[in-house]
Each structure stands twice: as C-alpha cells, then as structure tokens.
Amino acid sequence: MLPLNATITQIIEESPLIRTFFFDHKFEDMEPGQFVMVWVRGVDEVPMGLSRNNSITVQKVGEATSKLFELKEGDSFGLRGPFGKGFTLPAKGEKVLIIAGGVGAAPLSPYAEAAFAAGAEVNTVLGARSEEHLLFEGRFEALGTVYVSTDDGSKGFKGFVTDVLKNLDVTSYDRIAVCGPEIMMASVFRFLEEREVLEKSEFSLHRYFKCGIGVCGACCIDRSGLRVCKDGPVFSGTQLIGSELGKYSRDASGRRVKI
C-alpha cells in the first residue's frame, strides 16, 4: 500500500510534549484502537494510533516525532492504514471502564466515544505525571464519570491509576480497555489478574514496527509469537498471560530492550 499524502489542517498543543495533528483525510471505517503508519519524509515511517478519524496525537520522544513537531499547518506527511485490530465495541447497556495513562488516552478516546454511542455506560480512570499532561479529560467527561490521578497530586488523586482502581469494583464492569506507558499497563495487568477479570480486559501494545502489515515479524511478542501490527495492537488480557509485557521489547535489530 502506497502512502497517501495528508495535509495538516490544524495543530493543537495538548501539553508541552504532546500535539494533535488534524489532516485533510477521514478514515471513516477506522476501528478505535487501530493505527496508521506515518511517513515523516526524510526521516522514518512510524506507527501512531488514531485519536480521531482525521487526527493523530503525538508525543515528542525521538527523531521522527521531533521532525513532526517542526511541521506547520499546510505541511504534509504520508499515511498508510489504518492497520491492526482495534478494541471490541460493547453491547448496549454494558458497563465499560477506560484506563488511560499519558498519551495512551489518544487511542482510547475514540473508543470511549464509540462505546457511548453504542449505548454503553462509560467510566474512565485517567492518569498522567501532572495536571498539564492530562490528555482529553473533557472528551472523557462528556461521556461519564472520570477519576483523575496525577503522580504529583496537581489534580485529582495523588498517585497512580492502580491506586484509583483499588477504590473501584472492577468486577462490576463488562469490558475494560487499557492503554498507556507499558510499566503502567503491566501494573494494571497484575491488578486485574488478581481480581480474575483479565478475560474482560483489552490492552493496546506499542512495539517497534517495520512493515506494519504482519510480514516481517519484527513486532512479534514472546512467547506466543503474536504480531502486534496484525494480531494487535489490541490484545485480550488472557492473550498476554506469560508474555513479555512490562519486561522488555525489541529494537530495530531484534535485541531485547528492558522496559
């Protein structure tokens, strides 16, 4: 698949290190949780989750994202996709718990909106390092109750999302969707495993991609061999039992990198 040329129509600074880029194309059939391969010309092609059907929300972390941050409205980048498996939509009347940390709120926000539109009850646990790093709080508040936690206590509960979860009855939810830094997701995984609700949960993983379509195997996770780009990036909690989650990932050479 050749990349389409996407022209930037609007840039919103969500926090000092996070920006949302709107572009002049809508992926009408996207599944919330799917990703696109973003071609930053002259640098690299990298995977990014869709925060709407016409936007990506980007955290500045490396060469490709730093180059993206140099772009202005009217500039363009290449897009391929959407690819992968998204989150499972709930049935009408089901209860959905969103657990979002940092920029992990980006792919979860369209899922929360789609779940609400399907007639589900949607509650959110939203975590970040500090108040200025909270992402899409207003979007989640428009759908249901939001429990906020910040590492420094600048807003909401002082602590981590797992500290908030201790005060919730997670067994009362029909579906639980999780995305955020992998250390956070690993903690949430253990919490949900202890309460025997992994079968209700789904996690969105981030790994190094090369092809993005399931051919090269660069993003396979141990021990199952599941491909994050094709079989994921969203996996059920039970699929991740005994996996590398929270332990290590792999770099471009295939070498293990401790998380």
Swiss-Prot record:
Keywords: 2Fe-2S, Electron transport, FAD, Flavoprotein, Iron, Iron-sulfur, Metal-binding, Pyrimidine biosynthesis, Transport
InterPro entries reported in the protein's UniProt record: Cyt_c3_hydrogenase_gsu (IPR012165), Dihydroorotate_DH_ele_sf (IPR037117), Dihydroorotate_DH_Fe-S-bd (IPR019480), Dihydroorotate_DHASE_ETsu (IPR023455), FAD-bd_FR_type (IPR017927), FNR_nucleotide-bd (IPR039261), OxRdtase_FAD/NAD-bd (IPR001433), PyrK_electron_transfer (IPR050353)
Gene3D superfamilies, alphabetized: Dihydroorotate dehydrogenase, electron transfer subunit (2.10.240.10), Nucleotide-binding domain of ferredoxin-NADP reductase (FNR) module (3.40.50.80), Translation factors (2.40.30.10)
Any one Pfam family match given in the protein's UniProt record, by short name: NAD_binding_1
The keyword Transport appears for this protein: yes
Binding site for [2Fe-2S] cluster: C211, C216, C219, C229
GO biological process, one term: 'de novo' UMP biosynthetic process
Claim: Flavoprotein is one of the keywords in the record: yes
GO molecular function terms listed in the Swiss-Prot or TrEMBL record: 2 iron, 2 sulfur cluster binding; electron transfer activity; flavin adenine dinucleotide binding; metal ion binding; oxidoreductase activity
PROSITE patterns: 2FE2S_FER_1 (PS00197), FAD_FR (PS51384)
Span of domain FAD-binding FR-type: 1-89
Superkingdom of origin organism: Archaea
Assembly and oligomerization: Heterotetramer of 2 PyrK and 2 PyrD type B subunits.
Function: Responsible for channeling the electrons from the oxidation of dihydroorotate from the FMN redox center in the PyrD type B subunit to the ultimate electron acceptor NAD(+).
Protein name: Probable dihydroorotate dehydrogenase B (NAD(+)), electron transfer subunit
Native organism: Methanosarcina mazei (strain ATCC BAA-159 / DSM 3647 / Goe1 / Go1 / JCM 11833 / OCM 88)
The encoding gene: pyrK
